[in-house]
Amino acid sequence: MKNPFEAMKQLKKLQEKMAKIEEELEQTLVEGTAGGGVVKIIMNAKEEIKEVKIDPEVVNKDEVDILEDLIAAALRDALTKAKEKSAEKMGSLADGLPLPPGLF
């Protein structure tokens, strides 16, 4: 049987690494855009929206539905990028630890 103290040390390392990754995810910003950049959504890799920017030139009360579509598209783009960054950071979580393959 493996030394339980060694396993506890490895668990502590994993927890420390996880805390560091969580902090990095909070600081990592991604930008989703739509309509050639007229709508931008900035969020962190924890999927928390930080900013929404809309070019005033596209604000037209007769075309609100187009603006709504652009906002939704920019949000989807930002979410995709945030999830990619998160997966990238989480993939490094188990580096150097003797864990079963595919666990993270």
UniProtKB/Swiss-Prot annotation:
The keyword tRNA-binding does not apply. Gene3D superfamilies: Nucleoid-associated protein YbaB-like domain. Keywords: Cytoplasm, DNA-binding. It comes from the Bacteria. GO terms for molecular function: DNA binding. Residues 85-104 are annotated as: Disordered. InterPro entries: YbaB-like_sf, YbaB/EbfC. It is found in: Cytoplasm, Nucleoid. GO terms for cellular component: bacterial nucleoid; cytosol. Pfam families: YbaB_DNA_bd (PF02575). Its main location: cytoplasm. Disulfide bonds: none annotated. Binds to DNA and alters its conformation. May be involved in regulation of gene expression, nucleoid organization and DNA protection. Homodimer. Belongs to the YbaB/EbfC family. This is Nucleoid-associated protein DICTH_1981. It comes from Dictyoglomus thermophilum (strain ATCC 35947 / DSM 3960 / H-6-12).
